[in-house]
Amino acid sequence: LIFPHHENEIAQSRSAFGHALMAKYWMHNGFLNISGEKMSKSLGNFFTVHELLDQFPGEVIRLLLLSAHYRQPLDFTHDGLIQAKATLDRWYGVLRGRDVAPSASVPQAVEDALSDDLNTPLAIGAIHQLGDPAALRAGANALGLLQQDAEAWFRWTPAGASGPTEAEIEAAIAARQAARKAKDFEESDRIRDELKAKGVVLEDGPKGTTWKRG
C-alpha cells in the first residue's frame, strides 16, 4: 500500500460517526472474493452487510470471515455461509437445554492460536475440539460467537420468510402433546410432519419438545 491509500481514515470515520475512538487496532486484510472473483460494483457481485443480515444471523457472517487468516484472501460464498451456519448449529446444539455460563478463562489452545498473529482458523479448529460446554462457550465468546441464547438461535427467521409464527408452532406442539397423551400417535405424527413441511423441526427430549427452523 502506498500514499494516499487509507489517508485520513481516522479523521473521516470520527467525523462520520461521531465517536472519539473508532478502534484500538488497525489491520489491512486480504482481498474479499465472491465465488472466486474480487467483489466490486462493476462486476455486479456487490452486496451490503444489511442485505446479508436479512438472510443469516450476524454470527454466521462473523464465523465465515474468521475462517480465513486476516492476511489471506477470503472467498466469500453462499455455500460458505451455509457451512458456517451448520457449524454454529452444532455448537449451539451442545448448549441447548443447559444453563451454561462460559468458563472463567479462555481455553489455552484458543488463546495460543489467537496469540499467534490472530490465527483465527487455528482458533476455530481448537474450539471444535472442546468437549466441555462451558469451555466451548468461553472459546467461542473470544471470537464473538455463541453470544445468544440457544433457543433464540434456533428460532431465528430470515427476513421475509414465510412459515408459522412462534405462537402457531407452540399451539401445534401443545396439540401434539395432547394427542400423544391420548395415545393418538397418528395425529401426533401428522402434526410433526405438517410442521416439518413448513420448515419447523421438532425434537423430543427428556425435558419436553423443542423446535427449530431448518
Q: Which residues are covered by each model-predicted region?
A:
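Short coil/turn segments at secondary-structure boundaries
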Residues: 25-29, 64-65, 78, 101-103, ...
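Short helix-capping and inter-helix turn/linker motifs at the boundaries of alpha-helical repeat units
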Residues: 39-40, 101-105, 163-167
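Short, contiguous acidic/charged loop-to-helix segments that flank catalytic cores in large enzymes
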Residues: 78-81, 114-117, 160-164, 178-179
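Basic, alpha-helical terminal appendages of large translation-related enzymes
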Residues: 124-214
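Alpha-helical recognition segments enriched in aromatics with Gly/Pro capping
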Residues: 1-99
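Short, hydrophobic/aromatic alpha-helical segments in well-folded domains
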Residues: 9-12, 48, 109, 113, ...
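Generic alpha-helical secondary structure signal
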Residues: 59-63, 105, 167, 171
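Helix-loop elements that line ligand-binding/catalytic pockets
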Residues: 73-74, 80-147
